[in-house]
């Protein structure tokens, strides 16, 4: 079977959708004041551990990112409990949240390329 359609990939996609829904609708923590996007979920081979990569729409400082990640990791047990009710899996994976700053890095590279093309009058 093709690697893109294996069971762990499908479960990771379903986890991504459900975790995003839970964060947006079920977490009522007033300390989380930013919009959180779940960009990727990576599962271990035995499906017992999930790395959840999140990005934030409004990040003022690195300190804010760390605080929100700490809050999300503290709420991971609650999120896991809600996932257990939504998904029919034998094992609900342990969830650990990480910051995904690939959008900001990509935006920075794009700006640098635009500056270079303007300087050299090159069209890409």
Swiss-Prot record:
InterPro entries in the cross-refs: KH_dom-like_a/b, RbfA, RbfA_dom_sf, Ribosome-bd_factorA_CS
A cellular component annotation (GO) from this entry: cytosol
Subcellular location(s) of the protein: Cytoplasm
Keyword line: Cytoplasm, Ribosome biogenesis
GO MF term list: ribosomal small subunit binding
Name of one Pfam family that matches: RBFA
GO annotation (BP), single: maturation of SSU-rRNA
Oligomeric form and interacting partners: Monomer. Binds 30S ribosomal subunits, but not 50S ribosomal subunits or 70S ribosomes.
Family listed: Belongs to the RbfA family.
Function description: One of several proteins that assist in the late maturation steps of the functional core of the 30S ribosomal subunit. Associates with free 30S ribosomal subunits (but not with 30S subunits that are part of 70S ribosomes or polysomes). Required for efficient processing of 16S rRNA. May interact with the 5'-terminal helix region of 16S rRNA.
NCBIfam families for this protein: rbfA (TIGR00082)
The protein's name in its UniProt record: Ribosome-binding factor A
């Amino acid at each position: 079977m093709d690697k893109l359609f294996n069971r762990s990939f499908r479960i990771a996609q379903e986890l991504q959708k459900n975790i995003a829904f839970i964060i947006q609708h079920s977490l009522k923590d007033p300390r989380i004041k930013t919009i959180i996007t779940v960009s990727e979920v990576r599962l271990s081979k035995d499906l017992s551990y999930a790395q959840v990569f999140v990005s934030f729409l409004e990040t003022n400082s690195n300190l804010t990112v760390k605080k929100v990640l700490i809050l999300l990791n503290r709420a991971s047990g609650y999120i896991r409990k809600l996932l257990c009710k939504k998904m029919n899996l034998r094992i609900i994976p342990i969830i650990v949240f990480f910051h995904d700053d690939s959008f900001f890095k990509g935006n920075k590279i794009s700006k640098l390329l635009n500056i270079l093309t303007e300087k050299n009058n090159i069209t890409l």
